[in-house]
């Protein structure tokens, strides 16, 4: 959305609607997470595999959050938030556990993504979609390896938790309301700030990508594809299909351009979609570390995937 091109009244209305959706997501996520924790479903489902998970250093709450994230990623994050607040997992486990939810959640969407990508851009879309899912899988493996450090100590640590007194319903409800009271104002402010600044950041990326010096890597038509994909993947795929159809770029250059645009847009998407929710459900001390490692793991693999596709385009005739 272009803030400059609409009236201030229209912007405020759109912002308020977005804030309401954010608030509903935060409240619903925390409520569902607490219900799952208090129901005992996690312990029942994961008791058979708990010893093996313990050897890998993965807490049963985190493992359950991974499964739940396939259908409801925000509920999975709320489970981790509740376990962290209960003292069942450490800050390190909460950080990497939350990051691990992205891949299970993406798998559910990926079937639709690949179908759409192939439908719009054919072989280009297929390659692009597979790069995205492979990159997401590599990130999942990375954070799970980080999560599984010191795994041998998890068995003793879990045993000591069994004798801990369970938290009552009243205390859980009180904790949720206290968390909402402390975190919602910050979430609202941060979301509003990001909502207002993201369009300017997108335009700054777009202006940078039109630098003629970059045409040595990708033709001008390819950068047009990259700029389109900053806004939305569908726009980028459509631009790629058009550019390939006119012979302006080949498939390798189109995939490279799509990945560059995807990387440029991922930073603003993180600020717009992830951080506001994290601020709403996690304690404040956890969010900076979570954001830092999210960017480190995401941007590192995005850069590596771009480099690999660029090298491949030099030696492999994509067509």
Model-derived regions, located:
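Interfacial loop-to-helix junctions that mark the boundaries of transmembrane helices
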Residues: 12-20, 122-131, 181, 247-248, ...
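Transmembrane helical segments that form the transport core of multi-pass membrane transport proteins
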Residues: 31-54, 177-249
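Membrane-interfacial helix-loop connectors
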Residues: 56, 62, 67-99, 113-126, ...
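Membrane-core helix-loop-helix motifs of multi-pass transport proteins
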Residues: 88-147, 254-257, 276-308
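Juxtamembrane boundary at the C-terminal end of a transmembrane helix
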Residues: 203, 305-319
């Amino acid at each position: 959305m272009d803030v400059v091109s609409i009236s201030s009244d229209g912007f405020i209305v759109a912002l308020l609607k977005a804030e309401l959706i954010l608030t509903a997501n935060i409240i619903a996520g925390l409520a569902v997470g607490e219900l799952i924790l208090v129901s005992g479903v996690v312990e029942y489902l994961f008791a058979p595999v708990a010893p093996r998970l313990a050897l890998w250093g993965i807490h049963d709450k985190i493992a359950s959050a991974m499964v739940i994230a396939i259908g409801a990623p925000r509920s999975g994050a709320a489970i981790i938030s509740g376990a962290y607040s209960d003292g069942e997992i450490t800050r390190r486990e909460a950080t990497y556990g939350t990051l691990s939810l992205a891949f299970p959640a993406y798998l559910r969407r990926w079937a639709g993504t690949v179908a759409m990508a192939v439908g719009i851009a054919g072989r280009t879309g297929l390659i692009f979609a597979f790069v995205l899912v492979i990159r997401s899988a590599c990130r999942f493996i990375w954070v799970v390896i980080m999560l599984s450090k010191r795994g041998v100590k998890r068995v003793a640590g879990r045993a000591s938790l069994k004798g801990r007194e369970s938290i009552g319903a009243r205390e859980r409800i009180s904790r949720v309301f206290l968390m909402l009271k402390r975190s919602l104002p910050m979430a609202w402010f941060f979301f509003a700030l990001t909502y207002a600044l993201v369009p300017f950041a997108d335009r700054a990326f777009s202006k940078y990508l039109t630098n003629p010096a970059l045409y040595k890597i990708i033709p001008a038509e390819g950068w047009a594809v990259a700029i389109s994909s900053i806004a939305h993947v569908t726009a980028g795929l459509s631009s790629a299909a058009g550019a390939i159809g006119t012979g302006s770029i080949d498939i390798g250059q189109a995939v490279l351009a799509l990945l560059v645009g995807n990387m440029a847009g991922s930073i603003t998407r993180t600020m717009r979609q992830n951080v506001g929710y994290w601020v709403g459900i996690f304690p404040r001390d956890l969010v900076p570390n979570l954001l830092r490692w999210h960017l480190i793991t995401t941007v590192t693999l995005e850069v590596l995937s771009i480099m690999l596709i660029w090298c491949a385009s030099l030696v492999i005739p994509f067509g």
